[in-house]
Amino acid sequence: MKKIENLKWKNVSFKSLEIDPDAGVVLVSVEKFSEEIEDLVRLLEKKTRFRVIVNGVQKSNGDLRGKILSLLNGNVPYIKDVVFEGNRLILKVLGDFARDRIASKLRSTKKQLDELLPPGTEIMLEVVEPPEDLLKKEVPQPEKREEPKGEELKIEDENHIFGQKPRKIVFTPSKIFEYNKKTSVKGKIFKIEKIEGKRTVLLIYLTDGEDSLICKVFNDVEKVEGKVSVGDVIVATGDLLLENGEPTLYVKGITKLPEAKRMDKSPVKRVELHAHTKFSDQDAITDVNEYVKRAKEWGFPAIALTDHGNVQAIPYFYDAAKEAGIKPIFGIEAYLVSDVEPVIRNLSDDSTFGDATFVVLDFETTGLDPQVDEIIEIGAVKIQGGQIVDEYHTLIKPSREISRKSSEITGITQEMLENKRSIEEVLPEFLGFLEDSIIVAHNANFDYRFLRLWIKKVMGLDWERPYIDTLALAKSLLKLRSYSLDSVVEKLGLGPFRHHRALDDARVTAQVFLRFVEMMKKIGITKLSEMEKLKDTIDYTALKPFHCTILVQNKKGLKNLYKLVSDSYIKYFYGVPRILKSELIENREGLLVGSACISGELGRAALEGASDSELEEIAKFYDYIEVMPLDVIAEDEEDLDRERLKEVYRKLYRIAKKLNKFVVMTGDVHFLDPEDARGRAALLAPQGNRNFENQPALYLRTTEEMLEKAIEIFEDEEIAREVVIENPNRIADMIEEVQPLEKKLHPPIIENADEIVRNLTMKRAYEIYGDPLPEIVQKRVEKELNAIINHGYAVLYLIAQELVQKSMSDGYVVGSRGSVGSSLVANLLGITEVNPLPPHYRCPECKYFEVVEDDRYGAGYDLPNKNCPRCGAPLRKDGHGIPFETFMGFEGDKVPDIDLNFSGEYQERAHRFVEELFGKDHVYRAGTINTIAERSAVGYVRSYEEKTGKKLRKAEMERLVSMITGVKRTTGQHPGGLMIIPKDKEVYDFTPIQYPANDRNAGVFTTHFAYETIHDDLVKIDALGHDDPTFIKMLKDLTGIDPMTIPMDDPDTLAIFSSVKPLGVDPVELESDVGTYGIPEFGTEFVRGMLVETRPKSFAELVRISGLSHGTDVWLNNARDWINLGYAKLSEVISCRDDIMNFLIHKGMEPSLAFKIMENVRKGKGITEEMESEMRRLKVPEWFIESCKRIKYLFPKAHAVAYVSMAFRIAYFKVHYPLQFYAAYFTIKGDQFDPVLVLRGKEAIKRRLRELKAMPAKDAQKKNEVSVLEVALEMILRGFSFLPPDIFKSDAKKFLIEGNSLRIPFNKLPGLGDSVAESIIRAREEKPFTSVEDLMKRTKVNKNHIELMKSLGVLGDLPETEQFTLF
């Protein structure tokens, strides 16, 4: 911003003149106003094209105002006034009609306005009351409301937090003026953010529901922090400045206000029976917990959950409602498909097609509602004996002019109808043409209901005839994507016709019907009554779903709902998950079925003119009938007249009373408060929803608000009370409290699992440690076995043991993850190689056993070599000192989470093995729910900005983003998780099932619920795919060495974690002081930096580094500082969660408290004052206490030991079998291997590495390329080389060892890929290639591949074509 002071122009004296090009504003401050100022404003506006604000007020250019009025008003005075406020142009329009007209004109004149207005101008429309003379010109009168730009508040001193007190007039974020100093703004806090730096800043985000504002606290952060929180209503006072193009309040004082909440003050509360949450696929923004919290605040006794098409929120909803003391009602708003509708209706005789007379008809109408719209054209064709024998056609003059839209659709203009007969004259004549014929039409309900209703209106007759729908016939007899008349005609090859003219449509529909009659005869249908057989062949994907609410009444109903939901996703998913009406009828026990919104079957039929008897027949299917406030209108019904909707709801009420059905008023809730509507609009904006801005009032209403809406419809307080309070409560009383999940494990049953686990454990224990067992081993084994068996977890151990043994027997090692290495039983069963006993020696011959209690040794592998003092044999070294409590809790009752890393090549076989053990219908993939992440939510809001043309402030964008974040987007599956259903249960006892992401080609079913929600009820086996076991398998195949037999104390292997000496390379040329390139968990730049700083000398220190690198806020800003400051050594800092418990017990703390502190810290919850006090009493060092406070997540030691063990084995091969290591590495991890670059040598590799490392941000591919090139450089520096691919020698995928070199495989050639590479090997195995021509003929190689091969010498001296010689 440029600022000039003490300036003079003509007779105008300036205090200052500031130019802000980013905001497009010139700020002028003068001593006093004069006539010359107007000239100055015009001059500055002309020269700068910016808005000019004098002393905080924009002196708008009269010419500009006139141009805007001329451009937008035209000949009609829609705009009363044009006002500039900061960067906003406010157009004051005369009424709602004028607002709509000007909104339309703003879009069409955008280009001209952009040229007139300064950059960044936001245009707002404000409806004002038209003057009396304009009211006479039929400009609609708006609601009488005044929206003051500021309000006076009475502030109590005790609510003042600090600094300046509020000014007399207080603004809200949507009503503020830019550049007003000493401004007070009132709003609700929705976010607080603290930014640390040279200067600490506290950002407070305020909103009034219409707009939002960032308030910055600079010098008084400590006075504010902890005094205000999200949800508080405050008045912030300070300087309102324009920062980065938008207003920002620099806070100098804050006062807290009591929140003016909407509250339910009714003595008897209602029950909400229709509400959607963020689990309704990208449609609602209601948070489950906030929904329950609001219901509790309002005193609702019960609330329902009815998400679109799924029940995934049920577990979260139940937990929240239970805690709040509210009855949860589980349900769904289903996409119901009526597969039981008749093809022919009102059939009274059983004629054959040849005997019956049919009239095929089509109407053109002024709209879709027979109650209010009129027939303007009739076209009809009569069929007898399979032949067209007569036609009828007429245009009809309606009682009022037809709309432009109707003319566009039908091609019929008002002029064409002016001299035509009325419906009163036409109908008797047309009935004479019909006689006793059977009606035929395409989408026959529409035409039939129009005809029947107008016969009643005009002639007073209750008229009914049999009628056949060719649309329903098409869905039974044809397979099409669309069943429109056009599509059917095209499929049957009946030629072009003039659509949307009645006689043309009737003629072609007659041809369609006759063709269908022939098709029916071929399948044995010759009589009218036999047409009902066609119902069984109707394609469910062709049927249009309608909404239907289903509530769970009891446990049986919950299971039935789960079955219905499962089938809707697995059998009947088409665009949406569809529930067939026939299946709902079959599984209806324990369910209550509601009619849902106006898009439901009943509402739709009523709007389409169904008779009372038809509506009664439809209503009989439902247990209760829903009505909704008039401002809750389905998005595709926004043009629906409210008076018409009133009539429909009143009619449905009468029918329900006649049938003794409950009528309930529901809210169709999609967000909690009226001001949240903009959040849902932003959610819908990028989804192609044309009407996203015009949000219906889909918020949660109080009892009083709902009663007011019911009175608006029924104009009767008793009925209002009945539908709002009494009936919803009666339905809630009919529903039992159902617990969806018991929160106790239901393990699968394996006969004698307890006994097998005990026997296998003891057998192995005796084999290793002798019989009798050493006391420490005996006590540990007994403690673990008792916890495992008594809590029913033996079967989990047995499953894992069988899986590991199967993999090992097939030649693939298995790595353990998580805390399972804390269990000695798991080690003895072979589930994990991690031994959790203290570091110890054991003799494999005489079973001598010795525990080493020496703080220098944190791992048994680090113990000095020693011979058995009893028999002289070399002693084995083992043990890592890991307490069992970290795995199964202090009481041994925590569900054991056994995670196993299988080779990626073997994972699918492991999954199939589990299915064989328990049966395919008892094993399901663990389901996940993918939601909109914060970054994606920003994209939604930006799309909203683009489509509305409204530039949002950063604060308002934050508010909308927070609403959208967490909305369900799709589903998926855990990478290796399998959920096991016990043999005596069905999956529907726990969860519905579905395909991941609704992909029928996935080949697997997942749990419908996110696996975390059912983890306590079902056994979850994590059989993950991982590169490391594949790496180990390949190394074993290449060297013949069993990786499980390598020495875990090999000094040269250990040395590469602190230097490059064992590799024999120059660290400067390698650009690394340590030799861990390519070693899992230790090859990244971050961990290599840790290795350089710590220079580990033992296996135990490697474990600590692994823990430190995997934790959050454990190394940086924590352990690293304590080491550098000299407070602790690497061996003393907190690196894994077990360190806390072990250290505190060593200090004398009671073990259960030590365990609680460990659990708190590992989850990032810090420590309580009581914990801190006890730690100080035991003289725990202050740095240790502070370290506990900083940690956000801690890695389990067992997991670290497992990772380091795998890494150490791979490192052993790198040191002692280098070419085998590099062959395995590049084969398995070399996705970004570039043969062209690598074959150029080390200098080319170095150049590319410098380029990559200079990039500020690298994606996953670039990071992988860096890793691959680092290992390639290292290999070359160690004296090895790469050989180019060779058409006669290379493998498809594997790097092959040739002398001191690696032969590059075919799949590493750019653009070639596995499929082409494998085709080369197959062809080569059949017979050698004789020419390039032969190569291309017998493989998938193309010309581009050939050119690349030639450039790299892959083809050698292979001739271009076949060469034949006689001699």
UniProtKB/Swiss-Prot annotation:
GO biological process: DNA-templated DNA replication
GO molecular function, one term: DNA-directed DNA polymerase activity
EC number(s) stated in the UniProt entry for this protein: 2.7.7.7
Keywords: Cytoplasm, DNA replication, DNA-directed DNA polymerase, Exonuclease, Hydrolase, Nuclease, Nucleotidyltransferase, Transferase
Database matches in SUPFAM superfamilies: AF1531-like, Ribonuclease H-like
Pfam annotation, one family: RNase_T
InterPro entries (alphabetical): DNA_pol3_alpha_NTPase_dom, DNA_pol3_finger, DnaE2/DnaE/PolC, DNAPol_HHH, DnaQ, Exonuclease_RNaseT/DNA_pol3, NA-bd_OB-fold, NA-bd_OB_tRNA
GO CC annotations on file: cytoplasm
Functional note: Required for replicative DNA synthesis. This DNA polymerase also exhibits 3' to 5' exonuclease activity.
Family: Belongs to the DNA polymerase type-C family. PolC subfamily.
Protein name: DNA polymerase III PolC-type
Organism: Thermotoga maritima (strain ATCC 43589 / DSM 3109 / JCM 10099 / NBRC 100826 / MSB8)
